[in-house]
A protein has these predicted regions:
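Alpha-helical transmembrane segments of multi-pass small-molecule/ion transporters
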Residues: 1-323
Length: 323
């Protein structure tokens, strides 16, 4: 059973893409999930599961080698937001797409980065700690950067986004860490259940993002019309994220496994969180404002998967857990 669960979890990126395909061709499957607060609850559950995987010891790496963790956080919140803003301007994206694209670029790293780091034999402990740190920093940085960079397109309610991030990220993660601290035996018995639940929840959110865009008048035609430009934008964004993240680590003289981890944390974004924030804070621009998260999720999975495979082939097997 554990092998089956591990197989299911390791194919997380594939299930997300499958959900997009189902949502595009059979939107009724996910349409109900796009209504009300289902997406918010689903992302909160994902963040709760992330919190359950963390304990206070998870942050000990900060005290062992804090500079590399700080560098990963700086890379996350400079390379991606600025790249997203510049790409949106350079490609002349319509305002709804530009705002959605910038939200993706301003979000913290996603847990999928840990999977890419694991497969690619990057420094896994740095990846896990950096994902947690960027998620916590995102409580402030995501609303602030979205306000600064997307405010030229549409009015941005930074306080509203802050409330959303606190609700979706801070409270569930804090609750998860508390449960892990208070009831470690229970969390240990859960095994891989948290990762399985997270995979299902993120896949449901992915399908629920595209479904309402498809059923609107001319929805499929609009998505197809956006496809070429959005695939280009997403490829540039995540390609720059991986490339500049790796280069930044090299410039500061870090070993290859640390550079790979920084690249993963910079290049992979939390697309599910971006889609939910877009839905909650820009309802008048839905569902188009949620469309960029679809293309970004597909391209970051594709680029990350190719890099992980290449890194795995070219990297001797060794312990990649310690920072």
């Amino acid at each position: 059973m554990n092998k089956i669960l591990s197989w299911f979890i390791n194919l997380c990126a594939l299930w997300i893409i499958v959900a997009y395909v189902i949502g595009y061709f059979w939107p009724q499957v996910f349409l109900w999930f796009s209504r009300g607060r289902w997406m918010t609850w689903a992302l909160s559950i994902v963040m709760l599961c992330m919190g359950l995987s963390l304990d206070l010891g998870s942050f000990s790496s900060l005290f062992k080698q804090p500079k590399v963790v700080v560098l990963a956080a700086i890379s996350q919140y400079t390379v991606m937001p600025l790249s997203g803003w510049l790409i949106a301007m350079a490609l002349g994206l319509p305002k709804e797409l530009a705002v959605g694209f910038i939200i993706v670029a301003c979000c913290p790293g996603g847990t999928a980065s840990n999977l890419i780091a694991y497969i690619g034999r990057a420094n896994l402990s740095l990846s896990v700690v950096s994902t947690a740190i960027s998620t916590i920093l995102g409580i402030v940085m995501t609303p602030f950067l979205t306000k600064v960079l997307a405010g030229g397109y549409v009015p941005v309610d930074a306080w509203g986004m802050l409330r959303s991030v606190v609700e979706i990220v801070l409270l569930p993660v804090a609750l998860g860490v508390f449960i892990n601290w208070k009831y470690p035996g229970f969390v240990k018995k859960m095994g891989q259940a948290g990762a399985v639940i997270s995979t299902v929840a993120v896949s449901m959110v992915s399908g629920a993002v595209i479904a309402p865009a498809v059923v609107m008048d001319g929805g499929r035609e609009q998505i197809l019309a956006f496809a070429q430009k959005m695939f280009l934008a997403a490829t540039l964004l995540h390609g720059l994220g991986f490339g500049l993240g790796f280069l930044l680590g090299k410039v500061f003289g870090y070993e290859r496994d640390l550079c790979k981890a920084i690249a993963c944390e910079t290049g992979m974004q939390n697309g599910g969180l971006a889609a939910t924030l877009a839905k909650n804070n820009f309802p008048s621009y839905m569902p188009i404002v949620g469309v960029p998260s679809i293309f970004c999720s597909i391209m970051q999975s594709a680029i990350g998967g190719v890099l992980a495979s290449w890194w795995r082939i070219t990297t001797p097997e060794k312990n990649s857990l310690a920072v």
